[in-house]
Regions:
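Active-site-adjacent structural elements in enzyme catalytic cores
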Residues: 1-162
Protein backbone atom coordinates (compact mmCIF):
# COMPACT_ATOMS: atom_id res chain seq x y z
CA UNK A 1 0.00 0.00 0.00
CA UNK A 2 0.95 3.66 -0.17
CA UNK A 3 1.86 3.55 3.53
CA UNK A 4 4.44 0.82 2.88
CA UNK A 5 2.42 -2.04 4.35
CA UNK A 6 2.44 -5.24 2.33
CA UNK A 7 -1.08 -6.45 1.55
CA UNK A 8 -2.01 -9.99 0.50
CA UNK A 9 -4.76 -9.64 -2.08
CA UNK A 10 -5.40 -13.37 -2.66
CA UNK A 11 -4.03 -16.51 -1.04
CA UNK A 12 -1.80 -18.37 -3.46
CA UNK A 13 1.27 -20.53 -3.79
CA UNK A 14 3.21 -18.78 -1.02
CA UNK A 15 1.38 -19.18 2.30
CA UNK A 16 0.53 -16.06 4.30
CA UNK A 17 2.53 -17.46 7.23
CA UNK A 18 5.69 -17.58 5.08
CA UNK A 19 5.14 -14.04 3.81
CA UNK A 20 4.59 -12.79 7.37
CA UNK A 21 7.86 -14.38 8.48
CA UNK A 22 9.86 -12.82 5.63
CA UNK A 23 8.23 -9.40 6.01
CA UNK A 24 8.28 -9.26 9.83
CA UNK A 25 11.18 -6.78 9.88
CA UNK A 26 9.62 -4.64 7.13
CA UNK A 27 6.25 -3.73 8.61
CA UNK A 28 4.61 -7.13 8.26
CA UNK A 29 1.73 -8.02 5.99
CA UNK A 30 -2.04 -7.75 6.24
CA UNK A 31 -4.63 -9.74 4.32
CA UNK A 32 -7.05 -7.72 2.21
CA UNK A 33 -10.78 -8.45 2.24
CA UNK A 34 -11.19 -11.79 0.43
CA UNK A 35 -13.80 -10.46 -1.99
CA UNK A 36 -14.31 -7.16 -3.79
CA UNK A 37 -16.18 -4.65 -1.66
CA UNK A 38 -19.20 -2.71 -3.01
CA UNK A 39 -18.15 0.63 -4.45
CA UNK A 40 -14.44 -0.21 -4.28
CA UNK A 41 -12.52 -1.13 -7.45
CA UNK A 42 -11.41 -4.77 -7.51
CA UNK A 43 -7.79 -4.94 -6.35
CA UNK A 44 -6.89 -8.22 -8.09
CA UNK A 45 -8.39 -10.69 -10.55
CA UNK A 46 -10.49 -13.43 -8.99
CA UNK A 47 -11.91 -11.39 -6.12
CA UNK A 48 -15.56 -11.82 -7.06
CA UNK A 49 -17.34 -14.08 -4.63
CA UNK A 50 -18.19 -16.74 -7.21
CA UNK A 51 -15.09 -16.44 -9.39
CA UNK A 52 -14.47 -20.19 -9.64
CA UNK A 53 -18.08 -21.42 -9.71
CA UNK A 54 -18.55 -24.37 -12.08
CA UNK A 55 -21.68 -24.79 -14.23
CA UNK A 56 -22.85 -27.63 -11.97
CA UNK A 57 -23.58 -26.20 -8.50
CA UNK A 58 -20.99 -27.09 -5.87
CA UNK A 59 -21.96 -27.54 -2.22
CA UNK A 60 -19.47 -27.62 0.66
CA UNK A 61 -20.54 -30.34 3.09
CA UNK A 62 -19.12 -31.61 6.38
CA UNK A 63 -21.85 -33.51 8.21
CA UNK A 64 -24.73 -34.44 5.86
CA UNK A 65 -25.90 -33.92 2.31
CA UNK A 66 -28.59 -31.24 2.05
CA UNK A 67 -32.15 -32.54 1.70
CA UNK A 68 -33.12 -33.19 -1.88
CA UNK A 69 -29.65 -34.00 -3.22
CA UNK A 70 -30.17 -37.30 -5.02
CA UNK A 71 -27.58 -37.11 -7.83
CA UNK A 72 -24.00 -36.01 -7.21
CA UNK A 73 -20.28 -36.22 -7.75
CA UNK A 74 -17.86 -36.06 -4.83
CA UNK A 75 -14.66 -34.03 -4.31
CA UNK A 76 -12.53 -34.44 -1.19
CA UNK A 77 -9.15 -33.17 0.01
CA UNK A 78 -7.84 -36.70 0.57
CA UNK A 79 -8.78 -40.38 0.35
CA UNK A 80 -10.00 -40.60 3.98
CA UNK A 81 -12.34 -37.63 3.55
CA UNK A 82 -13.60 -39.07 0.26
CA UNK A 83 -14.57 -42.24 2.13
CA UNK A 84 -16.45 -40.03 4.62
CA UNK A 85 -18.30 -38.22 1.80
CA UNK A 86 -19.19 -41.56 0.20
CA UNK A 87 -20.75 -42.57 3.52
CA UNK A 88 -22.75 -39.34 3.70
CA UNK A 89 -24.01 -39.88 0.14
CA UNK A 90 -24.99 -43.46 0.93
CA UNK A 91 -26.81 -42.35 4.09
CA UNK A 92 -28.75 -39.80 2.03
CA UNK A 93 -29.56 -42.36 -0.67
CA UNK A 94 -27.82 -40.22 -3.29
CA UNK A 95 -26.48 -41.68 -6.54
CA UNK A 96 -22.76 -40.92 -6.89
CA UNK A 97 -21.75 -40.61 -10.55
CA UNK A 98 -18.05 -39.80 -9.99
CA UNK A 99 -15.71 -39.20 -7.08
CA UNK A 100 -12.15 -37.94 -6.69
CA UNK A 101 -9.68 -36.98 -3.99
CA UNK A 102 -7.39 -34.01 -4.62
CA UNK A 103 -4.52 -36.07 -3.18
CA UNK A 104 -4.12 -39.33 -1.31
CA UNK A 105 -2.89 -37.84 1.98
CA UNK A 106 -3.65 -34.10 2.19
CA UNK A 107 -0.71 -33.07 0.03
CA UNK A 108 -1.60 -29.42 -0.50
CA UNK A 109 0.86 -28.96 -3.38
CA UNK A 110 -0.72 -31.86 -5.30
CA UNK A 111 -4.21 -30.69 -4.34
CA UNK A 112 -3.57 -27.16 -5.60
CA UNK A 113 -2.08 -28.48 -8.83
CA UNK A 114 -5.14 -30.64 -9.54
CA UNK A 115 -8.05 -28.64 -8.09
CA UNK A 116 -9.47 -27.18 -11.30
CA UNK A 117 -8.71 -30.30 -13.33
CA UNK A 118 -10.69 -32.40 -10.82
CA UNK A 119 -13.57 -29.89 -10.72
CA UNK A 120 -13.78 -29.99 -14.52
CA UNK A 121 -13.69 -33.82 -14.50
CA UNK A 122 -16.61 -34.01 -12.08
CA UNK A 123 -18.56 -31.35 -13.92
CA UNK A 124 -18.01 -33.15 -17.25
CA UNK A 125 -19.07 -36.48 -15.74
CA UNK A 126 -22.39 -35.03 -14.59
CA UNK A 127 -23.03 -33.01 -17.75
CA UNK A 128 -22.16 -35.90 -20.10
CA UNK A 129 -24.65 -38.13 -18.30
CA UNK A 130 -27.30 -35.38 -18.45
CA UNK A 131 -27.96 -35.87 -14.74
CA UNK A 132 -30.79 -33.50 -13.77
CA UNK A 133 -30.41 -31.44 -10.59
CA UNK A 134 -26.95 -32.90 -9.96
CA UNK A 135 -24.56 -31.31 -7.50
CA UNK A 136 -20.85 -31.53 -6.87
CA UNK A 137 -20.48 -32.28 -3.17
CA UNK A 138 -17.13 -31.14 -1.79
CA UNK A 139 -15.55 -31.32 1.62
CA UNK A 140 -13.87 -28.08 2.74
CA UNK A 141 -10.07 -28.03 2.54
CA UNK A 142 -8.23 -27.48 5.86
CA UNK A 143 -6.99 -23.90 6.34
CA UNK A 144 -3.33 -23.09 6.84
CA UNK A 145 -0.43 -22.66 4.46
CA UNK A 146 -1.31 -23.48 0.86
CA UNK A 147 -4.52 -25.05 2.19
CA UNK A 148 -5.92 -21.54 2.73
CA UNK A 149 -5.68 -20.84 -1.00
CA UNK A 150 -7.38 -24.14 -1.84
CA UNK A 151 -10.11 -23.51 0.76
CA UNK A 152 -10.66 -20.04 -0.72
CA UNK A 153 -11.08 -21.43 -4.25
CA UNK A 154 -13.57 -24.03 -3.01
CA UNK A 155 -15.62 -21.39 -1.15
CA UNK A 156 -15.73 -19.28 -4.31
CA UNK A 157 -16.70 -22.33 -6.38
CA UNK A 158 -19.57 -22.94 -3.97
CA UNK A 159 -20.80 -19.33 -4.07
CA UNK A 160 -23.91 -18.54 -6.06
CA UNK A 161 -22.90 -16.59 -9.18
CA UNK A 162 -23.75 -12.89 -8.88
Amino acid sequence: DADGTARLLRHGGIPLEDLAHVLADHGGIVAAAPTAQPGVPMQAPGMTESHYAPMVPLLLVTTALPAGVTECALLAPDRATLTHLEGLAAAAGANVHASVALSETLDSVAAAAHLFERLHELEAALISRAVPAARIIAAPYPEGGLGSAIADRLRRAAATPQ
